[in-house]
């Protein structure tokens, strides 16, 4: 056996986080156990889990401090409530039948334990670590999480300690608010009034980036830290360099012009895959978007069918979205832009659009919040994480 478990329980300075490995004494876990006891490190000296002095728990468990213990207070907390919680939690697992299929004499456990230097409340330290060791152990023996849970959670979950969520586009349709503005005061007003919603995307428009540079992405991020932010750079040359610049500026996606040479487009897309951001091809003035997508060796994440502001009242609609998705041969989102108003949302969605790009209909509205909500209502999508506790399953 070589099983791995992890659990986070509690909050504040006393928060408990345990990484755990359980396996046979005769295997690699047993070797690691022996090495841990014999190869000591200052501030990270492992200790055995004991229920009380002279009484080990079984399976024998080695507690390894993750954070360097620098003073007597931390040492006392580790040798007191943490050690007691780990030992009692494992002993209770015996009573509850967690090990009924195993011989506890054959097994050992390595438990890497987080203890913040600021932790003070012994009661919380004990209770959080007690819950965490039991949860981590049961997860290890159950093989949690299954692949299905990982794939389901990877784009909807948020790390409980990190403090912000990195948005991904997995639950279309979305509303993209295009800020083709040149006044940071106006940008701040729009960002303040557009409601927080899992299905809202923020676009730093081309004029905004030309006026303030890519640093504007960071300014937007300060006001909307959890937002999915697009840098509409309309890349025409040096595709890899400009894609990297967008990623370095903390953009979640970058726009590449479909009029760029194929090699530039492909280099830009390749760079987005290296940096973990989305690639968007803007098909403004591209005569045959289907042909372009089919010709690319590496496909984008999103295609934007874009009618220019100067012709959005006279140009045709967005084209054959189904054919574009088919040409991509895989997962592809299609955004529709230019002249998108509330009354055409149903038409765009029915034609296969995944993202509705709206600019002045929101940013120039007298009531920005109300205008945004009108579009969101047409999406018929609930907020994903409105009532969600990110440590729950």
Curated annotation (Swiss-Prot):
Pfam families: Fae, OMPdecase. It is an enzyme of class 4 (lyase). Residues 162-393 are annotated as: 3-hexulose-6-phosphate synthase. It catalyses: 5,6,7,8-tetrahydromethanopterin + formaldehyde = 5,10-methylenetetrahydromethanopterin + H2O; D-ribulose 5-phosphate + formaldehyde = D-arabino-hex-3-ulose 6-phosphate. The active site is at residue 17. Its EC number is 4.2.1.147, 4.1.2.43. Residues 1-161 are annotated as: Formaldehyde-activating enzyme. Pathway: Carbohydrate biosynthesis; D-ribose 5-phosphate biosynthesis. Keywords: Carbohydrate metabolism, Lyase, Multifunctional enzyme. It comes from the Archaea. Substrate binds at residues 19, 48, 66, 68, 83. GO terms for biological process: 'de novo' pyrimidine nucleobase biosynthetic process; carbohydrate biosynthetic process; L-ascorbic acid catabolic process. GO terms for molecular function: 3-dehydro-L-gulonate-6-phosphate decarboxylase activity; carbon-nitrogen lyase activity; hexulose-6-phosphate synthase activity; hydro-lyase activity; orotidine-5'-phosphate decarboxylase activity. Catalyzes the condensation of formaldehyde with tetrahydromethanopterin (H(4)MPT) to 5,10-methylenetetrahydromethanopterin. Catalyzes the reversible formation of ribulose-5-phosphate and formaldehyde from 3-hexulose-6-phosphate. In the N-terminal section; belongs to the formaldehyde-activating enzyme family. This is Bifunctional enzyme Fae/Hps. It comes from Methanosphaerula palustris (strain ATCC BAA-1556 / DSM 19958 / E1-9c).
């Amino acid at each position: 056996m070589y099983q791995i478990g992890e659990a986070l329980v509690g909050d504040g300075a006393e928060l408990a986080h345990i990484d755990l490995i359980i396996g046979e004494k005769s295997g690699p876990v047993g070797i690691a156990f022996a090495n841990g006891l014999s190869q000591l490190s200052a501030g990270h000296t492992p200790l055995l889990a004991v229920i009380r002095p002279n009484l080990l728990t079984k399976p024998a468990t080695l507690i390894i401090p993750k954070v360097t213990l620098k003073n007597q207070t931390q040492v006392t907390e580790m040798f007191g409530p943490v050690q007691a919680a780990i030992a009692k939690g494992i002993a209770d697992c015996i009573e509850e039948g967690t090990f009924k299929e195993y011989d506890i004499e054959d097994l050992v456990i390595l438990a890497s334990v987080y203890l913040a230097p600021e932790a003070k409340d012994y009661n919380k330290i004990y209770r959080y670590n007690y819950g965490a060791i039991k949860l981590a152990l049961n997860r290890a023996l159950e093989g949690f999480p299954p692949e299905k849970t990982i794939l389901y959670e990877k784009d909807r979950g948020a790390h409980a300690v990190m403090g912000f969520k990195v948005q991904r586009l997995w639950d279309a349709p979305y509303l993209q608010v295009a800020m083709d503005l040149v006044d940071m005061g106006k940008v701040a007003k729009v960002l303040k009034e557009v409601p927080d919603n899992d299905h809202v995307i923020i676009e730093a428009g081309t004029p905004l980036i030309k006026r303030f540079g890519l640093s504007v992405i960071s300014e937007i991020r300060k006001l909307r830290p959890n937002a999915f932010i697009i840098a509409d750079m309309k890349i025409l040359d040096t595709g890899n360099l400009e894609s990297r610049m967008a990623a370095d500026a903390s953009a979640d996606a970058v726009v590449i012009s479909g009029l760029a040479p194929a090699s530039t487009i492909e280099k830009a897309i390749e760079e987005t895959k290296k940096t973990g951001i989305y690639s968007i091809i803007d098909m403004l003035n591209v005569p045959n978007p289907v042909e372009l997508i089919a010709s690319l060796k590496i496909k984008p994440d999103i295609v934007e069918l874009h009618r220019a502001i100067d012709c959005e009242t006279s140009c045709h609609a967005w084209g054959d979205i189904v054919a574009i998705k088919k040409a991509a041969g895989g997962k592809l989102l299609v955004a529709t832009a230019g002249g998108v108003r509330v009354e055409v949302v149903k038409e765009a969605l029915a034609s296969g659009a995944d993202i509705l790009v709206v600019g002045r209909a929101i940013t120039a509205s007298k009531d920005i919040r109300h205008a945004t909500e009108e579009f969101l209502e047409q999406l018929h999508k609930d907020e994903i994480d409105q009532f969600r506790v990110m440590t729950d399953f």
